[in-house]
Amino acid sequence: KYDAKDLESKLFVPERNKIIVDTYLKFVKDKRTVVFCASVNNAEQVADLFRANGIKAEAVSGAMKQSKRSKILKDYEEGNIKVLCACDLLNEGWDSPKTEVLFMARPTMSKVIYMQQLGRGTRLCEGKEYLLVFDFIDNANLFNAPLSCHRMFNIEEYVPGALVFGQGDRK
């Protein structure tokens, strides 16, 4: 778990938000994108910057009225909004198969949350061939590091054909 004030000082910097928007403009402009942000305030800041750059974007949160939130999500589904910026709200229980891009812009120590967020973009949809994920926090390296038997059992040297585990059970 992260301290909210510490996150504010580390993540809510204009330069970082600009990198997020610049990445969208350079690589995935006009693709439906979800930006997972560290807080509601952060989501609003990032959405503001997208709009300042001519991109139809909205922040969504549990703090807003249900009717407003539903309208924003409907507009996103219909393609009227290209970028959704959210904090936790869309992690689970929300499906949008048309989402083509995810921006991971919040840290998490939870593999479950990371996988839930990743799952928001993995839904199949006609015409969707792939999902692009941009990780601005490096969660991917934390949760997707390759795991081998050698690493699991602290075996430093790979020897072709050697037993990796169960060596003590041999008779």
Where would I find each of the regions flagged by the language model?
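Short, surface-exposed amphipathic charged segments that create phosphate/polyanion-binding patches used
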Residues: K1, L73-D75, L147-F153
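Conserved interdomain linker/interface between the two RecA-like ATPase lobes of SF2 helicase motors
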Residues: K1-V34
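A short beta-strand element within the Helicase C-terminal
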Residues: K82-T108, I113-R120, Y130-F136
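Short, surface-exposed connector motifs at secondary-structure boundaries
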Residues: K26-T33, N53-K56, P97-E100
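A conserved SF2-helicase RecA2
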Residues: V112, R123-R170
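A generic secondary-structure signal
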Residues: D22-K26, L49, D75, R120-G121
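Conserved helicase ATPase core of P-loop NTP-dependent helicases/translocases
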Residues: V34, N42-N91
